[in-house]
Amino acid sequence: GSEMCIRDRGEGLGYYGLANNIAMSVGPMVGLFLHDAYSFEVIFVCSLISCSLGFAMASLVKAPVKAPVKREPVSLDRFILVKGIPAGVDLLMLSIPYGMTTTYVAMYARQIGITHGMGVFFTLMAVGMAISRIFSGRQVDKGRVTRVIAWGMYLVCLCFFALSSCAMLMRLNETLSLWIFFGVALFLGVGFGTMFPAFNTLFVNLAPNNQRGTATSTYLTSWDVGIGIGLLLGGYIAQISTFDKAYLFGACLTVTSIVYFQWKVAPHFERNKLR
């Protein structure tokens, strides 16, 4: 994000975020296919090949060399964007149910009686993320960062409440539950594909030019920590209860994140944004 012109930064970060999020959707889909057809050794070999290809392609990227910036030997802002902490907390809360989804949704499906089509679920999620690029990047470039994030939050919130309700609906109307389950996949992709790249832009716009890398690092750290917490919490809640309760908890977290975003994050961004 630090090498793009300001006019196109929102769209550029959007494509970066899109690639990141689609990988998180395609990964479980491919993993499930390999698990059903081959051994774990094949899965790990494919992972190694994928990482090697990614490393080779990253090595081809050439960025202009910049003069090092003198800073204090040890300072908090070398590791985290202090102005981005409120947004980081909000993003972390949103990443928790995302982590639950990418890891446990296949087990949740089996628990409620959906035994086939998990590859379709992740495919629809990836398609939704691609669809989000049609409008969200341009909206961010027009300065509507907080509005785009809010749109994504509302959609994701509705999706998690719908996802948690599938267990109950399965007992009442199996066909309706299946439509909702796979519809949730598509709209979760749209919501997260809209929201996460816009969050990246929000972090970058809070940072001076010499801290744009720190801003992106803060964004990624919040996202990764949230996903990790989602793995732990999702497994724990499912162990003491059921997966639908885990997704209901995730839905409640998204409500909390919406309230916190409107009350704290958006006003803080409007006061402190640099571009």
Predicted regions and their residues:
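Helix-loop-helix hairpin linking two adjacent transmembrane segments in secondary transporters
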Residues: 15-59
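Intracellular juxtamembrane helix-capping segments at the cytosolic ends
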Residues: 1-3, 194-207
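C-terminal ends and interior cores of transmembrane alpha-helices
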Residues: 155-173
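Cytoplasmic helix-loop-helix junction between adjacent transmembrane helices
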Residues: 1-18
